[in-house]
Amino acid sequence: MYNVLTDLQEYYETEIRILQQTKERKEVSTLQKNYAIQRCLGASFYAQRLGADFDKIDKLYTKCKKTIDNI
């Protein structure tokens, strides 16, 4: 069975990994962080439309946002 939350978490991890790799080469700008957060939020809305549980999406998104903010 297709698991939307697993795909969503993998997407978040990819966004975080991209920012971390960017940070290794140069400083990550606030604009880059905000853009990554917006992409994660968009993926969250899409996951909700596919029927994923909102509370679980919110928990994953909050964790992702905090991680991105700390990069």
Regions found by a protein language model. Give the residues of each.
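Short, charge-rich amphipathic interface segments used for partner binding and complex assembly
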Residues: 31-70
